[in-house]
Amino acid sequence: MSRFWHFKKFYFSSCFSKQRMSRRIIKNELLVPMKVTSKHEQEQPITNDEPRSLLSEDANPSPDVESEPELESEQSENREDVHEIIRSMVLGTGTTLPRLSNDSLTGIYNYWKLNPNDDLPLYNPTKYTPFEFHSQYNQDRSYISTPRLSVTKLLVFSWCELRSFYQVYSGSVRLPSTQAMTQGTKLHSKLEAEIHPEIDTTEIEQFLLSNAMSLGELQKAVPIEEDKVVFYLGEVERLAVDWAEMLIERLFSLIMGAEAREILLHGYLNFNNRSFVTNKDEIRDPSSVLVSGIVDYVKLQNLTNPSDGTLFDDIHGFVDDNFDQVDNVPLVDLSKFLPEAKQILQHYDFRLTFTDVKTRSAPQIPRQESVLEAAKFQTFYYRHFFQLLSRDSRFTYFSLIENAERRGHDVDKPLSILTTICLLRKHYHILFKDFVRLANGEPIGFAPFDDSAKSMAYDFVSVFQSSDEFSLANPNHTHFFEQLREIDGIEYDSILSPLLKVWKTPPTLRYLAARASQLFGVFEENLGDVTSVEYRLNKTSQLLSENVYEYDFSEFQVEVESASKFWNGEREAVPTEDLSRCSFCEFQSKCMVAGGNTTEAVEKKTIGPKIRHFLNECESSSKG
């Protein structure tokens, strides 16, 4: 019988009779009275002011405890083993705590209340699952305010599951950015700009703010309580900009130009059944965890003839024949375009392919099989998310609404005037017609939005005047348009004049969710099973290699189940068998596996954490 089970049997026979031990050692904080320091902090000795060692009478059952005769002999024999275990869990008086080598180690030793002289255990001594801990103790506060996971977080096996496990319980300490990471980010931005050139609205924003502040009658034009509607740029506005750019604009580009980069995707992973939610009624289930990701590159093409462009000829022909232009740019009416585009796509055997781009600082691809497998499954996640979001526009609409609301956003809050004008400038070719509808209080043709959109006055006229011609009674915008045109040459009078009024329906996150969900729905019949991973040299963007895969749902579901069990605490982390990887790990100096310990030694060192876990369960049971 192992030492742990000796302890467990002994503990049950005494703890639940008088519960003397539970009053003293049931609390984790009494087991190890210390705070561990990193190398950046001062060493702190344990003094006599700390809680007493548990090696006195507190660790023994009361002498008046009556136990069954058959247990007395075994209790006596095992008591010394138990005392030794407890003694190993508590620092002696006057002990000096050593410094740990990095913040990640400091974090996990403090959160787990470990003796810094000991190695890290392989067993979670807390009552929190990895996801629960990740959502409560995280250096990135956004994960606490909005509990969620990313696709890359699900790929815990990529390097070493034990490292991923320790990273979670260290408080998800952010590792410093390396030069290779910085170069990789620059390459991603470069590739993105090649397809989606950035439109910088900084000068326009500065002009609008300066002009508004110079209006002598600003407070009459915009009451004080509405100032935030004009100028405020908060989290709602930032999400609106992201949805307009990385959903609506990117999906429209995919329809019109066959390719798009950096598209936002998400799904809801139900930990109970270990699969992604497919029914809108399950989205709000507490066990459904938001999982987000960004797919690097999506292409719509004829797989048997990649040079075939007839589909896009038809779509461009429809746009040119049916919509007016401003500055040689068609003003697309999405209410007419979306159903027609979907019908055109259904007549062609074009399929979507999904690619993730990995940057390399050296001209070679990874040699580790687990790293290559993780990259493959990353593309599988993106492909699966796209399927979930394109199969039913209503589901996608409510999925996006839930996404925003989980982040604490009011989806019916009007966007600021400044945000609206910037969205119009960047995306007037697809938003202008919709904005006219909103201004007039007309439906956009998508029932879930039209049935729930809230009508309210939205003043989109007062601040669009120059101070030298300002008038509340008879607004004059001539000079204002001239000043705007000097900034970037756009024909603002054509795209602004019809909107300069008090709108009946304001632009909101709800509106953007509606159009994004419809754009996803255009691709319902054109989803493909080909995914790939590109490896590029980050300094030159040279393509080093491309690994192509065939999406396999059964294989993907096995990975989803494994990730779910890890994050829900249903299985233990599996350490890497390749110890050469340990030299890159921040936990190496305290990891049993990296130290090459035998199985017997590892098992022995997990006794303490198992006891902590057991005591937590005892505490929960006694409270219940």
Curated annotation (Swiss-Prot):
Which is one GO molecular function term here?
Answer: DNA binding
- Residue ranges, annotated region (Disordered): 37-80
Q: In what ranges is there compositional bias, type Acidic residues?
A: 65-75
Write out the residues that bind [4Fe-4S] cluster. Answer: 160, 582, 585, 591
Q: Which InterPro entries does this UniProt record tie to the protein?
A: EXOV
Q: What is its EC number?
A: 3.1.-.-
What are the protein's UniProt keywords? 4Fe-4S, DNA-binding, Exonuclease, Hydrolase, Iron, Iron-sulfur, Magnesium, Metal-binding, Mitochondrion, Nuclease, Transit peptide
Q: Where is this protein's transit peptide?
A: 1-61
Cofactor(s) required, per the database record:
Mg(2+); [4Fe-4S] cluster
Q: Which domain of life is it from?
A: Eukaryota
Q: Any one cellular component term from GO for this entry?
A: nucleus
- UniProt-listed GO biological process terms: interstrand cross-link repair
Record family assignment: Belongs to the EXO5 family.
Family annotation (PANTHER family): EXONUCLEASE V
SUBUNIT field: Monomer.
Give the protein name, as stated in the record: Exonuclease V, mitochondrial
User: What organism is listed for this UniProt entry?
Assistant: Candida dubliniensis (strain CD36 / ATCC MYA-646 / CBS 7987 / NCPF 3949 / NRRL Y-17841) (Yeast)
Protein encoded by which gene: EXO5
